[in-house]
Curated annotation (Swiss-Prot):
The gene is rexB. The keyword ATP-binding applies. It comes from the Bacteria. It comes from Streptococcus uberis (strain ATCC BAA-854 / 0140J). This is ATP-dependent helicase/deoxyribonuclease subunit B. Keywords: ATP-binding, DNA damage, DNA repair, DNA-binding, Exonuclease, Helicase, Hydrolase, Nuclease, Nucleotide-binding.
Amino acid sequence: MKLLYTDIENSLTEILVQEAEVFANSGARVFYIAPNSLSFEKERTVLEHLTKESSFSITVTRFAQMARYFTLNKQKAQKSLDDLSLTMLFHLVLHDLSQNELTIYHALKSDQTFIKQLVDLFKEMQSANLTIADIEMENLARKEDLITIFSALSRELLRYDFQQMSSLAVFQEAIRSGLLDQELAKTVVIIDGFTRFSAEEESLIHQLHQKCQEIVIGTYISSKAMKQNFTKGNLYEASIDFLRQLSVTYQVKSLYLSGEKTFKNSFTTMSRLLESQYDYSLTELTISEDIKNDVQIWQQLNQKEEIENIARDIRQKLNEGYRYKDILVLLGDVEAYQLQVGPIFDKYDIPYYLGKAESMSHHPLVQFMDSLENCRRYNWRKEDIINLLKSRMLGDFTIRECDQFESYLNYADINGFTAFSKDFTANTFNQKNEKGYDLDKINLIRKYLFSHLNQFFKSRAQKGSNILNHFLQFLSDIDFVSSFQRLSQKQSALQQEKDEEVWKSFTSILESFYNIFKDETLTQELTLMLIKSAMQAADYRVVPATLDVVSVKSYDLVEPHSKSLVYALGLTRTHFPKTVQQTGLISDQERAKTNEKWDSHHRFDISSIENSKKNHYTALSLFNAATDKLVLSYPMVLNEVVEEASPYLKLLHSFGIPIVEKQKNTFSDLENGIGNYKSLLSQWIALNQEPLTEELYQEEKSFWLVMSRYLKKQLAAKKLTFPEQKSHLATSRLSPEVLAIKYPDHQPLSLSSSALTVYHDNQYKYFLQYVLGLQELESIHPDARHHGTYLHRVFEYVVDDQRSIPFDDKIEEAIQRTNQERLFQTYYQSDAESRFSLSLLEDIAKSTASIFPITPTKVLSQEERFQLHFDEKVRVNGIIDRIDQLDDGSIGIVDYKSSQTVFDIGKFYNGLNSQLPTYLEALNTREKSKDMPPQLFGAMYLHMQDPKMDLNEFKLFDDKVVEKLYSRLTYKGIFLEREKEHLASGAYQMKSNLYSEEELRNLLDYNQFLYLKAEKEIRAGHFLINPYTEDGKTVKGDQLKAITRFEADLDLGQARMLLKLPTKEKREGFLKLMKEDMKGGKKDEI
């Protein structure tokens, strides 16, 4: 064995390649071993350093792959065990274990995260050369559960003839048997890039040391560090401990070698300054101007600005002659940056490769399998059928057809096998009695889904090969492959490559399932669960089509001298250094206790114990990753959390490397900021979209004027337009063309009292409801609208019944007649919940109707339609529920309400309570048209309710209870003062609601003023997002948050403030304000 080390300014790979060539030229077979994460890059680097740029005697690989070279044809043929097969086997094992066998983990049997933890523990134990019984655990019940699970897994592996040992363990067994002595005698193993071995790797090294021609292990250590006796906290602590342990174990002295090629002195000086800092020695080295040019620290506002500035600098470097493959981008937090790196690099036309496997779990193919399995498991649940259809892999239906089908399922609340097995018949009807859903088309989709799924789900328990064939036949019947191809072809080229990799993984999972379970008797439900679980656990990786791309990866996977230009992003205190804390089914404490019990060839790696020395070595590798220029960057805000610079960066700053504060990407850095056409266009768009935070210099203004003219010509040539973007709460005015069609000048504007209320509640709500015509989704389950319609119909029948029979009989008969109508049978007979609602409505109808006999009025008409015109500009349509007549001949209006509603003069003034005045105006106009002087007594609401009383409030059960009960069943609204004596004997609440004829006229005139003012604003076509507020602190109007993104605490300034007056001055004050407004005094305040 040879142990080599060299200074960081040298190329360790160059030194080790020279060693490899010497052995290869002497006839030995050389395996050049690199860590798993670096093997691809290392292979390219080794080839670049070979004298002839290639050699059949030198193989660059990993430990596991080297093992396969030797054992592929030497051992008994057994099935290889990959992660997906292991996942399916764990699912099968857990499925068969009962609650008595698993006391702790039984509830997690089907949990995907738990199964992944089991897979990770299985591989960790293989790497540690340990079994589950060897682990010291604090909770014995938990250990017993894990022993039960892994024992059952071992039996399954043996039964299915899987290789239970890892490839390294099989390799070691072959070495011990002597089968490989002849080959290993001419084999040299060169190991590069390691600062520690796992227990399994260390055991393999021990075996190879006895059989191989030579083992060469190299690492980076400075001559100064290697001479130190005390190395705790040293920058090279990890590699020093690594070599010294090997030196002691194998009684070999470490040798220092220097390479022919050395890298820039800037990085060497910086490394020696860091080394002196951590070994507490003195040095005369200082930071020169060359170092400041080669190593830069950038402080950024946030991660978006950080990536933007990096992209702009990359474009500049490309203009200086660098190629994409010369550039490496390192990320401090891959999860936080990967979603933003792609779009920004695409904007700047920077091809990149992020060497990170992507999970299949969010791909539509996995969603299809998940929905299919859930549909089988949960008996045709509505949500699963919808998701299955939306995956677009079951049938060739348009998006519109899928949306209509989903809308109908939600409306009719279709759930379960029985509901899907028969034709859908329930439907909605509009006012013209037109059907709301095209049931012919919807039933065609239902028939297609049901026929294929029902045929597929009929499968019984059978052999795995048969059940898989049945599944493949189902995919063939629904033309699954064509559907997948059709969806993929509509995607970008990159997404198509991802789809291809996903498809490969899917077919590989099906192949693994067949190989494992072809002779096993399984149910269809278990089969789908096993395939789905493997797909959810699967990862895929897209390989770039060209090598000339910018490499992007995590900074802790870098090695020294990787690329010419290196940009390290996200180097905050939180992520640099990283604090690794292992999570899983066993704790670090349990790992440590287990290690105390076993030797070095049987132990766990505990990352948390080695965090410090590993982080120092990672920082050293990062600071020497570039050969020309290194940019170290950190944002002040990351993931919406305020961050500060890494301690390592602060240390470099203390040496004299300045921190460059990169401000927000403005438009001043012209010569460096414009890298290509797309980035120029994006900045011009930003210039037009955002208000400038600073004045531009004359030179900058001239530049952007010229660029604007150029880009406008380019856009015009391509027939593209540049839409102007407003702030997130701003709305655009409707175009004149739309207004001319929607509101022709020669036609009056059609409004209703409810539309007027909606307009004053929030103008944008009026736009959505009455301009765009958006409606709430219908449901077969009745809501307040249906309840109100039902009660209206009952009262209509009661009032129309003029027979001389007991009033209670009239009510009962009216209820029965209403219940027989098709509309109400649809809503109130579909299920137990709707039938319960019907019983409550019947009680309300009986209670509310009980005041009809004691009301001293005559009903003149019901459900009377009217049309009212204001100055030929507004046409108001509506329906009056009931018109009553007193004994003196005066008439009034009754409007039924399913909720507590009163006439409030303050809300009326603010445009929120115009119904009763509108109805009074309509009745007044009707009477005038008959050439009769109108004689009105008022307009009122009747709250339809079944009053509940708290009997604890009464000492005696006497007439006061009945009096209190009927006090809640009263008419409330607007009453004429002159009719007071005729109303006194009825159930009318007249307190504070009596108006003189002059006051009533004032109300009606102001009501007309509200309609005309709204008409003028609506015809202007600009609808504001302005829900109303009563107190200036809370918003009462409909905010429509899901559409407008209105936030009360941020956007309160856009809310419409209602005018309020003190209670004592309320009536007189608002009547006075109405007169002033109609005279033009305060028109703009409403």
